[in-house]
Amino acid sequence: MVQIIKDTNEFKTFLTAAGHKLAVVQFSSKRCGPCKRMFPVFHAMSVKYQNVFFANVDVNNSPELAETCHIKTIPTFQMFKKSQKVTLFSRIKRIICCYRSGFMSNLIFEFCGADAKKLEAKTQELM
């Protein structure tokens, strides 16, 4: 099941509930075409991977949370364990981007775009 997150407090509660398990958060918008294509995929993954926590944040309804999580484009998927973003990268381009913007000390795994295969592969890897 995909939990709908409406604000920062719900987000913190969601991450706390996930604890040591993987939490996958989709930042999206109901008006975004690629986001619409990913909704059924994301839901299907939540059914398939019962031991993973899944949540969706609509950036139009939660702009403060989107800003706090540094969401620049949608859909964006971030993965967490123990309330911390997972420290893996899938592409060198992302590392360079974070290095240039000063985030090298807080490396994260996230990716943007509607790539269902990549999302599922990374979820399996991090479980």
UniProtKB/Swiss-Prot annotation:
SUPFAM superfamilies per record: Thioredoxin-like
Any one Gene Ontology BP term: cell differentiation
Disulfide cross-links: 32-35
Predominant subcellular localization, coarse grouping: cytoplasm
Gene Ontology cellular-component annotations: acrosomal vesicle; cytoplasm; extracellular exosome; Golgi apparatus
UniProt keyword terms in alphabetical order: Cytoplasm, Developmental protein, Differentiation, Disulfide bond, Golgi apparatus, Redox-active center, Spermatogenesis
Domain Thioredoxin intervals: 1-92
InterPro entries noted in UniProt: Thioredoxin-like_sf, Thioredoxin_domain
Highest taxon of the lineage: Eukaryota
Cellular localization per UniProt: Cytoplasm; Golgi apparatus
Note: Increased levels, possibly caused by overexpression, are observed in morphologically abnormal spermatozoa from infertile men, suggesting that it may be used as a marker of aberrant spermatogenesis.
Role: May be required for post-translational modifications of proteins required for acrosomal biogenesis. May act by reducing disulfide bonds within the sperm.
Family label: Belongs to the thioredoxin family.
Protein name, entry field: Thioredoxin domain-containing protein 8
Organism annotation: Homo sapiens (Human)
Gene this chain is encoded by: TXNDC8
